[in-house]
Regions:
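Amphipathic alpha-helical packing segments from all-alpha helical-bundle domains
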Residues: 106-120, 126-153, 164
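Helix-loop "lid/cap" segments that line or gate small-molecule binding pockets
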Residues: 85-91, 102-108, 114-126, 197-202
Length: 204
């Protein structure tokens, strides 16, 4: 059984994915979980505190590379498999949490609603721009590390530009995720196919 805190966070996530921050009230969240507004204050003293908790748990924690991807054997080929598996697992969790109120999502899709949450973090989360940059930079460095090792061990061509290759993988993922969020969500089969095409160009 979920604790009140978990219920509050999940209900708040659904509301912040489907509405702008300014439009969401603690009273709306309290009503959705069967608590009084005062009851929510026992967990979160303000709407901003609740929004920060939602972003920390369902964005920054869920998307952290250390939580999102299983360890690979060190090769880029295996990392691609682990990356796509981690993306699929995370996406399933987001859809599971968000689609409870699917009809209220922007475009009626949890995936589009999740991008909506990212945008709100940029504007309402304290120093959100810096925190988002740190998260993106962490994942970029992970790609650079894997590609660098793969060049060093001879898996990839020695003339591979490590940073450009890492940026290419990241931008394919971000671009495809955004484009497909307005239909049925990211197709991880297509993502894998695009990644393996890039891999084929880099492979020794």
């Amino acid at each position: 059984m979920k604790t009140n805190r978990e219920e509050i966070l999940q209900s708040a996530l659904q509301l912040f994915m489907s509405m702008n921050y300014e439009s969401v009230s603690l009273q709306m969240i309290a009503r959705s979980v069967g608590l009084t507004k005062t009851g929510i204050f026992n967990y979160y003293p303000s709407k901003l505190d609740l929004f920060i908790a939602v972003a920390d748990r369902y964005l920054f924690h869920l998307q952290d590379p250390g939580n999102k991807f299983a360890p690979s054997d060190g090769s880029l080929r295996d990392f691609i498999d682990k990356y796509v598996e981690g993306v699929a697992r995370t996406m399933d969790e987001i859809v599971r949490l968000g689609n409870i109120q699917r009809e209220k999502m922007p475009g009626q899709l949890a995936n589009a609603g999740y991008f909506h949450l990212f945008q709100q973090v940029l504007f309402y989360y304290p120093d959100g721009k810096h925190k988002l940059h740190e998260w993106m930079e962490k994942e970029f460095r992970l790609w650079c590390d894997v590609i660098g090792r793969s060049v060093g061990c001879g898996e990839l061509r020695e003339e591979t530009d490590i940073q450009e290759a890492a940026a290419l993988f990241r931008q394919v993922f971000i671009g495809l995720s955004y484009q497909m969020s307005f239909s049925d969500g990211l197709d991880v089969g297509i993502l894998r196919k695009r990644f393996l095409y890039i891999y084929g160009l880099l492979k020794r």
